[in-house]
Amino acid sequence: MFVAWRDLRFAKGRFALMGTVVVLITALVGMLSGLTAGLGRENVSAVTGLPADRLAFSAPADGQELSFTDSSVTEEQWRRWAAAPGVESAEPLGVTTVRAEADGRTASVSAFGVRPGSGLAPQEDALRDGRAVLSEGAAEELGLTPGEDLVLSGGRELKVAAVSGDASYSHTPVVWTSLDDWQHLARPAAGGDANGPRATVIALTTADGFDDTDRAAADEAAGTETATRDDALQAIGSFAAENGSLQLMRGFLFVISALVVGAFFTVWTIQRSGDVAVLKALGASTGHLLRDALGQALVLLAAGTAAGTAIAAALGAAVGGSVPFVLDAETVAVPALVMTALGTAGAALSVRRITSVDPLTALGSAR
């Protein structure tokens, strides 16, 4: 690293400029990662927080994907799943977006209907017909506390039994209601028929030995299509579109960082060809020169990503109260490590030229 440190001191301006680029890209990736995680949490936290490992949807039409919006399951389907081998618990869950009013305030909320005692809702002991459990976001937007009343779409009046959790769905706070109350809210879209009243999906808790064969047999018997809880997130339309776009942007930033670092060290290596030739003529091995060049790249990347990560963390902490932003190791440290790895890969590809430098040719051309 002797030559690498001398280069860093000699060409301070060049390396400072490149380091600034790394800092800015790292900060941008860190901010985008935190924002992606925050927006995703506002989209899906109510679903990821369910004490279930699978969700059963009504079977979609040919060529269509699973969707919470289009799904509607019957009581008969729920009972078939409850009796299926390997299923420890099967509970109907209604999901719909409604308008809530209270004391002159209005807000869009997601009504989640569950059977009292099902274990799906927070503080479920307070939940029954005519009562609702509000997420903290819903209570804040409507200015409600336990014991007060709210009116949901269609004139359905409910009393706030409790305020608990920060669940949200499709960027709207969640209001937990009884399944009977939810069916009144969702009617006529989820009205009853000969097979009984409907819900949106069936939340399933399955035994350890429950496999794809068991799932396929139960799906066929009930006329449903089942997905794991994580896979079911793609059935939330806003999440699939939003998360895909943001992840694509983040991926492009990673690729750009590797290209920028690689381009810088390609030019730098070309400019140093004469110096490399002299070192080779003096007996320096190719491996030593490669380690020296890669060490130089690692120093630059480590310093740049550390500074960029610190900036992203500081900005994330500052805006966390006003925008959906998740500040943790996964959203800040992981992008920095990926940036360092990709930048090192780009630098490694660029410094390969060192292996092809012929000391006699380079020294002869220098004369």
Regions found by a protein language model. Give the residues of each.
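Alpha-helical transmembrane segments of integral membrane proteins
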Residues: M18-L28, L246-A263, L300, G304, ...
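Hydrophobic, regular-secondary-structure patches
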Residues: T26-A107
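Membrane interfacial helix motifs at helix-loop boundaries and amphipathic/re-entrant anchors
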Residues: G38-G49, D62-E65, A167, R229-F252, ...
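Hydrophobic secondary-structure segments that place a key small or acidic residue at a functional site
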Residues: L93-T96, E101-P116, A121-P188
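Mechanotransmission and gating elements of multispan inner-membrane complexes involved in transport
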Residues: G155, S164-L253
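Interfacial "coupling" helices/loops that link adjacent transmembrane helices in transporter permeases
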Residues: V260-L301
